[in-house]
Amino acid sequence: MTASLDHRFTEFLLESQALKFGEFTLKSGRKSPYFINAGAFNDGRKIARLGAFYAEKIVEEIEAGNLPKDVDTVFGPAYKGIPLGVSTAIALTSAHGMEVGYTFDRKEKKDHGDGGMMVGTQLADGMKVLLVDDVMTAGTAVREVIPKLKAEANVEVIGLVLSVDRMEKTKDSDTSAVKAVEAEFGFPVFAIANVKEIFEAGQRIQNADGTPYVTPEIKAAADAYLEQYGA
């Protein structure tokens, strides 16, 4: 029997050393006992596998009727979203037969050559754009990129796919960052896995010495953190 998507993705996070345990200060200022380091996906094999996971999640949501079948382009916000968007578009085409473009933004407008703020598939009115990003903390990146997209063309943003949903409430409410973005922009947000699924799987996945990656101590620290900040 094939393991679930969230279980296989957790294995990948652990094998890639992208899931770290300890004490980490997040952008929000919160002290977290775990951290997802997207910088660990730093070679061709890892980024190809990561794109395959994103593509699998996207196809799963299309088949469930939660996303439309006709995605025109996958958009990854600069800088971390660029390899995510490109690798996801490649995987959607090569593994799932979908003809889909990729697009990303420039941080600074180019004043020579083709110019403009966008690279890749150029945006046009009516296009269906699917966003990809790594981990959402407060939704800042989404709020920055939506106006950029709308300034280019009257596109339809059909959804956002994350690698991990941290399932945390925002600073000023008990609503999760994911739910806040969904309510504000009107499109669905999906994640390959959420932190509860990851810690559940991590207790069953073993190190080379036979011990679980997620020990009772690590799980207790994560539970305490989510008790305080979880949504």
Curated annotation (Swiss-Prot):
Keyword check for GTP-binding, yes or no.
Answer: no
**Binding sites annotated in the UniProt record for orotate:** 137, 166
What EC number(s) does the entry state?
A: 2.4.2.10
Coiled-coil positions: none
Q: Which InterPro entries match?
A: OPRT, Or_phspho_trans_dom, PRibTrfase_dom, PRTase-like
Query: Which cellular components does GO assign to this protein?
Result: cytoplasm
> Which processes are annotated in GO (biological process)?
'de novo' pyrimidine nucleobase biosynthetic process; 'de novo' UMP biosynthetic process; pyrimidine ribonucleoside biosynthetic process
- Where does this protein act, in terms of pathway? Pyrimidine metabolism; UMP biosynthesis via de novo pathway; UMP from orotate: step 1/2
Binding annotation for 5-phospho-alpha-D-ribose 1-diphosphate: 27, 79-80, 106-107, 110, 112, 133-141
Provide the assembly information. Homodimer.
Functionally, this protein is described as follows: Catalyzes the transfer of a ribosyl phosphate group from 5-phosphoribose 1-diphosphate to orotate, leading to the formation of orotidine monophosphate (OMP).
The similarity comment for this entry is: Belongs to the purine/pyrimidine phosphoribosyltransferase family. PyrE subfamily.
Name-wise, this protein is: Orotate phosphoribosyltransferase
